[in-house]
Amino acid sequence: HDQRLEPVDLQLLGTSASKQQRPGRDQAAQADRSDRPAGEQQHQDPDALLAQFPGAQGERLVQFAGSTADSVFDLINKHAMDVPHTRNGWIQGAHTAAGVAQVQHRAAQWAKHGVTGARALSGSETAALLGTDKYLGGWLDPRGGGIQPLSYARGLARAAMNAGASIYGQSPATALHRDGSSWRVETAQGASVRAERVVLCTNGYTGALWPGLARSVITPNSFQVATEPLPEAVANTLLPQGHVSSDTRQLLLYFRLDHQRRLIMGGRGPFREPSSPTDWAHLERVLGRMFPAAASAPIAYRWCGRVAITRDFLPHLHEPQPGLLINIGCMGRGIGLQTAMGRAMANYLLSGKADALPVPVTAVAKFPLHRFRQIYLSAIIAWYRMNDGGLA
């Protein structure tokens, strides 16, 4: 039985999901566990997951949610990947009093579920660990960390090829259909791949490969900027213990220092595709206000990519026909989430046992008012930005 993997729908490996304003060096970086969309955070607390999925399913999901960072760092170490990374913990900063109560509750929940070192932080502790005084408190999750995701994508590809997989670049999939007892995937180059089973993981770039799938998610842009490498004296004052961070805003901010001492900051931007550097101006203003010591640092890179958000802010699995498994909805957390989900899906495809999956397999369902998404999302983003603390 041939178990070879034939991934298609790739452009240059690891780069097709990000549009860089400045071409050149491979500088796409974000913090693992940091890019979380508006409204999603409360749905990831263990108590909320257990309430939504009682019994063994909920316990499985909580365990899965808590293991995603382990999946990433374990693979990096197992395959000796050349991936710049740190694992000193993730801090969620609270920008309001309500946010302080939220993160205190969240820290207590994860501590109750066995996360050693999960704890709430005072305002002064948060300021000392992040290098900014813009938060009233926070919580520390020691499981989190940061990686260079392009290096990670290439490391995964190399490990897969070493295990016998074939990877085809510059071969976007254009059609998917049944061909007797198997599936045929057509590509833009005219070539096709036949397979007994297909896993469809197009997420924020889902097109028309499967009916209704693109209408099951909304896909806002996540924008990021990176400074030129900071002087060591400045960099040492920002996230001095190597944490990565995001916050409790509806339009959250996430930030970290990379291995070259670049300060990287991300957040929401226009729903439309960017047209000029001014589309990143709000992030640059925020960066300067949060970290005055870095305010004069030139911005070296600006880029963005689409994230897929589901109705319930959880990843969705669909199996509309035998041999076709669909995974969609990373909510901006694809590095850890999809690393762990890939292993779970592989176990399911090999065993046929549904309890190998962290979430139940469901039918594809349309997102409400999907055709008007750009209108209402733009209005929601503007409202959130006005009420999120005024940093931008």
What are these regions (language model features)?
Residues H1-H43:
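Short, strongly patterned local motifs
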Residues Q42-S124:
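Dinucleotide-binding Rossmann-like beta1-alpha1 core, especially the glycine-rich loop
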Residues Q44-G55, L136, L263-G269, L325:
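A short small-residue
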Residues G55, D82-Q92, E125-A159, A163, ...:
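Helix-loop-beta segment of a Rossmann-like dinucleotide-binding subdomain
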Residues D70-S71, I76-T86, A173-A175, S182, ...:
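Active-site substrate-recognition segment that forms the wall
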Residues A101-K112, D133-E196:
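Helical element adjacent to the flavin cofactor pocket in flavoenzyme catalytic cores
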Residues A118-L121, S166-Y168, A300-R302:
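General small-molecule cofactor/ligand-binding pocket signal
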Residues G269, E273-A392:
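C-terminal catalytic lobe of FAD-dependent flavoproteins
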